[in-house]
Structures are given as structure tokens and as C-alpha cells.
């Protein structure tokens, strides 16, 4: 049975929070390490991740990457450093 009332429900403080408590900008980097079957696949993956970073950035994202031949294939190691933690979180959601 639902409660019926003509008076609107007021909730002071509901759905509000201090953004500084969520994003303190201590963590602005994402390291990605994957092994691909071919160097071409690793390069395509790097291009994909780079484009996702470029789509998110408000200031240039610093990207350091290398592709190395390993026993199982080709290891892509990439470090994406954003200007703020909020951009990092958006990037993480877009690549998930």
C-alpha cells in the first residue's frame, strides 16, 4: 500500500555530495598491459585506447607506450596520464 499525500517530499541533502571527497586527483593514470597475437593487433589496440583518451581529454593526455615481442605474442604496455581524476574515470568507463 503506497502512502498518498499532496505535499511534495522534501529531502535536503539527498543526491548531493562533495566532489572533492570523490576526486582528489591523486590518481590520474591508467596503465594498460595486454598480450596480442600479432604486432598489428597490438598497434590497433593502442590506436583504440589513444582515441578513447583523446575523446576524453580537456588538456593533452600524456601517453607513453611500447610494444614488445614476448613468448606468447606482442605485449602492449601503455601509460595514460590525464590532467584530472574525473577524466581518468570517464576513460576507464569508455574502455570497459
UniProtKB/Swiss-Prot annotation:
Gene3D superfamilies: 3.30.70.860
Pfam families: DUF406 (PF04175)
Family matches, as InterPro entries: DUF406, UPF0234-like_C
GO cellular component: cytosol
Similarity remark: Belongs to the UPF0381 family.
Protein name per its UniProtKB record: UPF0381 protein HI_0636
Source organism of this protein record: Haemophilus influenzae (strain ATCC 51907 / DSM 11121 / KW20 / Rd)
Amino acid at each position: 500500500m503506497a502512502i498518498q499525500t499532496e505535499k511534495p517530499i522534501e529531502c535536503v541533502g539527498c543526491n548531493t555530495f562533495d566532489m572533492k571527497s570523490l576526486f582528489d586527483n591523486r590518481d590520474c593514470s591508467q596503465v594498460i598491459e595486454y598480450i596480442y597475437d600479432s604486432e598489428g593487433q597490438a598497434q590497433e589496440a593502442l590506436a583504440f585506447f589513444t582515441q578513447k583518451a583523446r575523446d576524453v581529454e580537456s588538456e593533452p593526455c600524456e601517453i607513453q607506450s611500447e610494444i614488445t615481442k614476448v613468448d606468447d605474442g606482442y605485449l602492449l604496455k601503455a601509460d595514460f596520464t590525464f590532467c584530472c581524476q574525473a577524466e581518468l574515470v570517464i576513460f576507464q568507463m569508455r574502455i570497459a
